[in-house]
């Protein structure tokens, strides 16, 4: 399924949080996305009822936590209209129904149950999204523990029974992938944390480096697997999150900042450089064993303590050797995000790079991998 239906949206919509209400609640979610490739295609949505990575200290949501019993009541796709600079902040302006929406079914049924940890693929639905138009999505879910993310950066509205409301980062459950039967050269995933996901970039602006890179090479099917607070230790467990990464041809791994800040659940402390390198090595080996080409990123600068900066420097000095040992390419966008000298660890565009930082990081990707004959990935 993952070879036929590939990502066609560059924003991250994985799960690092959970709507844990201890009672069944209903959520109607509507979102607008800019598709990577426009046109008339067959689409399927893909969802996994579990939490991919650990959020903050892990008291509410932690990697591989099971979701609850979810009932999916309805789902739709539609042409969301012209991309016209709308701010998508006033839910009262949203129509009750999406004009021209196509109903999504699941094994020919309009609703379905999603068990804890279950994977769900919808049936296909054919829809035309003209160039310069949004892909609009809506679904209604009921459950007492629904995995989600607060940091998707999409134009999202949530109706909890009092009409659509929006915010900068509403807790909104969304499909893990908007799969599209479209032509592509390769499937390219970005496995990372909030910096990859694009936290602190403008909502609905597609300013993060992953979205900017996707715009540079629309013939590639880009899947943003970045999640706020995510650790390499989360991915190294080789569960629901890394399974997504294994469905790609190339994966750019940019993990480690939160390991140095927070550490893994098991350790209960900040990870040391050697521990982090061991977890990154597990990720490399697992991905390569699945036939995936791995590109390693140096860790970007962050607001670390002086002790953590020492570990950060040690990791960045070790990654090139790790890449040599395992035959990985290197993506060094760390230097372009530095305000000071090399390895000074002074963020130039904010600890979470803003839109300018996203542009600089994407430009570095182009310099590293674009040649006169094409992309070398």
List PLM regions with ranges.
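N-terminal secretory targeting modules
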Residues: 1-191, 196-197, 201-203, 374-377
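Structural motif
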Residues: 136, 250-254, 295
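Conserved SGNH/GDSL esterase-like catalytic core that processes O-acyl groups on lipids
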Residues: 185-190, 195-281, 303-306, 310-313, ...
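Surface-exposed amphipathic alpha-helices with a cationic face
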Residues: 281-291, 320
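A short helix->loop->beta-strand "cap" motif at the edges of active sites that frequently abuts
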Residues: 290-294, 328
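Catalytic His-Asp segment of secreted/periplasmic serine-dependent ester chemistry enzymes
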Residues: 301-377
């Amino acid at each position: 399924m993952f070879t036929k239906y590939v990502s066609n949206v560059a924003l991250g919509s994985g799960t690092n949080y959970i709507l844990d209400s201890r009672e069944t609640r209903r959520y109607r979610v509507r979102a607008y996305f800019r598709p990577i490739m426009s046109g008339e295609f067959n689409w399927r949505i893909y969802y996994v009822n579990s939490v991919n990575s650990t959020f903050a200290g892990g008291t509410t949501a932690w990697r591989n936590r099971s979701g609850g019993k979810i009932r999916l009541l309805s789902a739709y796709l539609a042409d969301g209209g012209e991309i016209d600079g709308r701010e998508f902040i006033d839910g009262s302006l949203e129509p009750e129904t999406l004009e021209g929406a196509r109903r999504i079914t699941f094994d020919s049924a309009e609703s379905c149950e999603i068990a804890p940890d279950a994977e769900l693929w919808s049936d296909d639905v054919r829809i035309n999204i003209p160039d310069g138009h949004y892909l609009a999505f809506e679904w209604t879910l009921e459950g007492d523990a629904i995995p989600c993310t607060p940091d998707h950066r999409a134009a999202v509205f949530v109706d909890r029974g009092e009409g659509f409301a929006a915010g900068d980062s509403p807790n909104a459950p969304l499909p893990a992938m908007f799969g599209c039967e479209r032509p592509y050269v390769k499937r390219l995933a970005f496995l990372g944390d909030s910096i990859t996901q694009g936290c602190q970039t403008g909502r609905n602006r597609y300013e993060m480096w992953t979205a900017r890179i996707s715009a540079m090479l629309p013939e590639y099917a880009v899947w943003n697997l970045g999640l706020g607070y995510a650790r390499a230790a989360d991915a190294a467990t080789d569960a629901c999150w890394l399974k997504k990464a294994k469905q790609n041809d190339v994966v750019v791994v940019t993990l480690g900042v939160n390991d140095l800040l927070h550490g893994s659940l098991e350790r209960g402390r900040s990870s040391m450089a050697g521990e982090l390198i061991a977890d990154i090595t597990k990720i490399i080996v697992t991905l390569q064993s699945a036939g995936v080409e791995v590109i390693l990123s140096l860790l970007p600068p962050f607001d670390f303590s002086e002790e953590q900066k020492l570990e950060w420097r040690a990791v960045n000095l070790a990654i090139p050797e790790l890449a040599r040992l395992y035959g990985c390419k290197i993506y060094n966008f760390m230097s372009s995000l530095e305000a000071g000298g090399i390895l000074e660890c002074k963020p130039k565009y904010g600890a979470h790079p803003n839109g300018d930082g996203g542009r600089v990081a994407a430009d570095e990707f182009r310099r590293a991998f674009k040649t006169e004959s094409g992309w070398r990935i």
